[in-house]
Amino acid sequence: MKQYLDLCKRIVDEGEWVNNARTNKKCLTVINADLVYDVGNNQFPLVTTRKSFWKSAIAEILGYLRGYQNAADFRALGTKTWDANANENQAWLDNPNRKGPDDMGLIYGALGRAFPKPDGGHVDLLQQIVDDLSNGIDNRGEILTFYHPGAFDLGCLRPCMYEHHFSLLGDTLYLNSTQRSCDVPLGLNFNMVQVYVLLALMAQITGHKPGKAYHKIVNAHIYEDQLEPMRDVQLAREPFASPKLIINPKIKTLKDIETWVTLDDFSVEDYQHHDAIKYPFAV
């Protein structure tokens, strides 16, 4: 929690104003932030200075792992995070590649589970990684990427957290996640949960102990209409102790994640938090 608040304060104190063309808003911005989550010791990085809807964050990462590309599928899992970008993003609404209401296109897990090959085929990057790690293999390239510049026009939004690199040391699994852009007040509390859960789940289904997850953010920003509640409300609150995340130990395989896992398979213990803060969302 401290590293999250330190980043928020750093942006408020040291950030520079940048005009964002996509949203037509100004952002208070810093470059480069590195966060670390101790998954092995169950130090769950859930924000306590406001209520965080952790179930929605987990539903979103589950949707990525399943390769979903329709906002309705994400809603069925338990999150509405893609409703706006699928249905209110004017550039996507005007894109001839959009297939209709709720279509998100080729983004995130939909790309990672079927990464295009030059010969017209596809590679399931996630399945390859799971197969390798399950057999104790780390080829120094166990990378799940969602970033393909040639496919940007096929989706409603470029991936923000675009790469997850898994590494084995002995029987301990580590994760390095890279994020090109981060809406810190709204997005980071979700992204921290997702990086943590991704390592915890991947370690569990490949038979390894989870180690630490390293989360690099390149462009970290606070939108102009988010600055006041962040500076005057959230940063003025004292954080509570970190809660614990419990994952159903019956989740054993990638197929389990793809077929029957729901939010009921996750629970959080001892989550004490301040009141929610409604931050504006930039589409």
From Swiss-Prot:
DUMP binds at residues 22, 180-183, 191, 221-223. It is an enzyme of class 2 (transferase). (6R)-5,10-methylene-5,6,7,8-tetrahydrofolate binds at residues 183, 282. This is Thymidylate synthase. Its EC number is 2.1.1.45. Pathway: Pyrimidine metabolism; dTTP biosynthesis. Gene3D superfamilies: Thymidylate synthase/dCMP hydroxymethylase domain (3.30.572.10). Catalyzes the reductive methylation of 2'-deoxyuridine-5'-monophosphate (dUMP) to 2'-deoxythymidine-5'-monophosphate (dTMP) while utilizing 5,10-methylenetetrahydrofolate (mTHF) as the methyl donor and reductant in the reaction, yielding dihydrofolate (DHF) as a by-product. This enzymatic reaction provides an intracellular de novo source of dTMP, an essential precursor for DNA biosynthesis. The active site is at 160 (nucleophile). Homodimer. The keyword Secreted does not apply. SUPFAM superfamilies: Thymidylate synthase/dCMP hydroxymethylase. HAMAP family: Thymidy_synth_bact. One of its GO terms (molecular function) is thymidylate synthase activity. The keyword Transferase applies.
